[in-house]
Curated annotation (Swiss-Prot):
Gene name of the record: tsaD
Lineage of source species: Bacteria, Pseudomonadati, Pseudomonadota, Gammaproteobacteria, Pasteurellales
Cofactors required: Fe(2+)
Residues binding substrate: 134-138, 167, 180, 277
Name of the protein described by the UniProt record: tRNA N6-adenosine threonylcarbamoyltransferase
Subcellular location field: Cytoplasm
Catalytic activity from the UniProt record: L-threonylcarbamoyladenylate + adenosine(37) in tRNA = N(6)-L-threonylcarbamoyladenosine(37) in tRNA + AMP + H(+)
Function of the molecule: Required for the formation of a threonylcarbamoyl group on adenosine at position 37 (t(6)A37) in tRNAs that read codons beginning with adenine. Is involved in the transfer of the threonylcarbamoyl moiety of threonylcarbamoyl-AMP (TC-AMP) to the N6 group of A37, together with TsaE and TsaB. TsaD likely plays a direct catalytic role in this reaction.
Family according to the record: Belongs to the KAE1 / TsaD family.
UniProt cross-references to Pfam families, sorted A to Z: TsaD
Keywords for this protein: Acyltransferase, Cytoplasm, Iron, Metal-binding, Transferase, tRNA processing
Gene3D superfamilies xref list: 3.30.420.40
Length: 344
């Protein structure tokens, strides 16, 4: 069974092909970062237009990379939500049109289930059950994962996602969009303990997150440390970046520890764009070492949005007999707990 996967939920156009026998045989990705950088964030209309321009050429490239033709494809999976409605509609329309033309089934995949299952593409894949930390620009969630589709939401951000807080704070520090990776780089030269940021919602029970206050705290810290010219010294920028990053990471770790204690699991999966953060990976590895558990990640290129995770998640469900009718419909908001469980 060979599945074509299409990802167009935000500002990356991803196309991949997953082969049941060979694994991932093609992976193509186009990022719109340069285009949106001029605006300091994703412009939905521009994102949709660019997906229209890029998706079909990437599909052709993926088929070429895998040395396949359209007649070899057994199903088409696409991101149906959550995400930007216009961007989702582009991928959905193209996927359904191809599925109809090729006379194969189509399936709308949940974007965050794709992220959650991305570590399954690695040689050292986790076994069920496990706790998943899904941490990106749009989501910060802790999920009890018993099997594919058998999910219980343990906690989530009540305001800004962790990745969103990274990008907003990076902008306050004068870094270009997207600022998460740039802030992490700046933090490498930071001085520990010069600034102390709060660890939001860690002083109370529960597994929910809140990161909007950290951005406000960062803004106040920046304003309080401007020099006579109204500028931040470079070392001060590094120190603020360090303090902010540590606050986010320690908050995530505290909540992960609680989730593992609550479930009794010894396996932790971390996925989503922020999971590429080196310091977060290091500190979570230390946590799991302390409790005698294991932590699993996707490779860095599969931390951000990509077609590979959609092709794989789609393969699992299409193989199980699921498919979506030919009507073009997307779900900009879509709780993952609504998904049906399947046996794998």
């Amino acid at each position: 069974m060979k599945i074509l996967g299409i990802e167009t939920s935000c500002d990356e156009t991803g196309v991949a092909i997953y082969d049941e026998d060979k694994g991932l045989v093609a992976n193509q990705l186009y990022s719109q970062i340069e285009m949106h950088a001029d605006y300091g964030g994703v412009v939905p209309e521009l994102a949709s237009r660019d997906h229209i321009r890029k998706t079909l050429p990437l599909i052709q490239e993926a088929l070429k990379e895998a040395n396949l033709t359209a007649s070899d494809i057994d199903g088409v999976a696409y991101t149906a939500g959550p995400g930007l409605v216009g961007a989702l509609l582009v991928g959905s329309t193209i996927a359904r049109s191809l599925a109809y033309a090729w006379n194969v089934p189509a399936l709308g995949v949940h974007h965050m289930e794709g992220h959650l299952l991305a570590p399954m593409l690695e040689e050292n894949a986790p076994e069920f059950p496990f706790v998943a930390l899904l941490v990106s620009g749009g989501h910060t969630q802790l999920v009890d994962v018993k099997n594919v589709g058998e999910y219980e939401l343990l906690g989530e951000s009540i305001d800004d996602a962790a990745g969103e807080a990274f990008d907003k704070t990076a902008k306050l520090l004068g870094l270009d969009y997207p600022g998460g990776a740039a802030l992490a780089k700046l933090a490498e030269s930071g001085t520990p303990n010069r600034f102390t940021f709060p660890r939001p919602m860690t002083d109370r029970p529960g597994l929910d997150f809140s990161f909007s206050g950290l951005k406000t705290f960062a803004a106040n810290t920046i304003n309080a440390n401007l020099n006579e010219k109204g500028e931040l010294e470079q070392q001060t920028r590094c120190d603020i970046a360090y303090a902010f990053q540590q606050a986010v990471i320690e908050t995530l770790i505290i909540k992960c520890r609680r989730a593992l204690q609550q479930t009794g699991y010894k396996r932790l999966v971390i996925a989503g764009g922020v999971s590429a953060n080196k310091q977060l990976r290091h500190d979570l590895a230390e946590l799991m070492k302390q409790i005698g558990g294991e932590v699993f990640y996707p490779r860095p290129q599969f931390c951000t949005d990509n077609g590979a995770m959609i092709a794989y998640a789609g393969f699992l469900r299409l193989k199980n007999g699921e498919q979506t009718d030919l009507s073009v419909s997307v779900k900009p908001r879509w709780p993952m707990v609504e998904l049906c469980p399947i046996d794998v």
